[in-house]
Amino acid sequence: MFHSKAAFLKVENLEKSPVSVELGIEMAAQFGGDCYYPDGTVLRTPDSWKDFFRIFFPSNGDSGASESDQINILGNHVGSYSAAVGYHFPTWKVKAYWEHFFEDRSGMTLTYGMWRDCLTGLEVTLPENPFVKTVVGEFLYTKHQSGAFHYFATPAIDHSFTGADNYYNNSQYAGWEHWGQGIGNPLVTSPIYNKDGNLAFESNRVKGFHIGLNGSPTPEIDYRILVSVAKHWGTYGSPYRTIRRNQNGLLEVTYKPDQIPGWSFTLAGAVDGGNM
C-alpha cells in the first residue's frame, strides 16, 4: 500500500512586493503486502489500522512487524524538503528552487552536517518572448547520503552510524519503482534497465545537469528542447569500478494548424548515450 502527505506554505502578494516564497515538506511510504526474497522466503508485512497510524505518524512497528521495522520505522519512507524564491519583473520572472530528499532520520536532521544531497534549479519565464518562453537549469547531487557507513552500536563498538541511505532501495521492499520504472528523479536509472533482472536501483549516487527550454516562434508552432547529462558512482554497497556516464536529449515540435481548430500534431526525436 501507499501513503503520502505534504504541507506547503506560499507567501505572495504581487501588489505589495515582487518577491514570492514557497516552503514545504513531502513524505511518502510503502507498507503492507508481501515481500519476496531471492531465497523464496515470503514476508507478510502488517497492514492494520494501527499500522496505518504508525505510517501516518512515522514510528516503530510492533511485534508483528519484521525486526528491521521494529528497530527502525515501520514501512519504507522517503521525503523531501522544498524551498523556492521567485522575483517578478514587469515583463518576466525568475525562480530559484531547492529540494533536499531523505530516506530516514539521518537525512531529515543536520546530524551529519549540512545537507549536500539536493536538486537545485533556476527557472526563467519570458512570456513576451515568442522564441524562448521558459528556460530551466537544474543540478542534481545524491552522492553523500549521510555518509558512507551504516552501523548500529554493539558492545564492541558503542557508536552508531546511520549513513549509506541507499536512496530508493530498501532491504524489505523492492524499492521506489513500479514494474521496473523508478518513482523519483529520472536521472537515477530505473531497475528496468538492469541487465541481470535485479529490481534494485544499481546506481543512486549521481551527479547530473539538466537544461530545458521551450518557445512558440509562430502562433501555430511550439517547440521543446531537453538535455541531461549525468555521472554515476553506483551505490555505497556496490560501487562502480569506474565512473559511468549517461546523456539524454529530446527535441519536440508541435504544429497546431489554424485551419483545424482543436487539432495538433507533434513530432519528437530523442537520443540516449553513455555506458549505463
Residue ranges of predicted features:
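Short glycine-rich, acidic/polar surface loops and turns
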Residues: 249-256
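Low-complexity, intrinsically disordered Gly/Pro/Thr-rich segments
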Residues: 264-273
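Signature for the C-terminal beta-barrel architecture of outer-membrane proteins
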Residues: 1-152, 156, 209-211, 227-236, ...
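C-terminal structural cap/anchor segments
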Residues: 146-235
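A generic structural motif
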Residues: 247-249, 273
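Short amphipathic alpha-helix initiation/capping segments at coil-to-helix junctions
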Residues: 202-203, 242-246
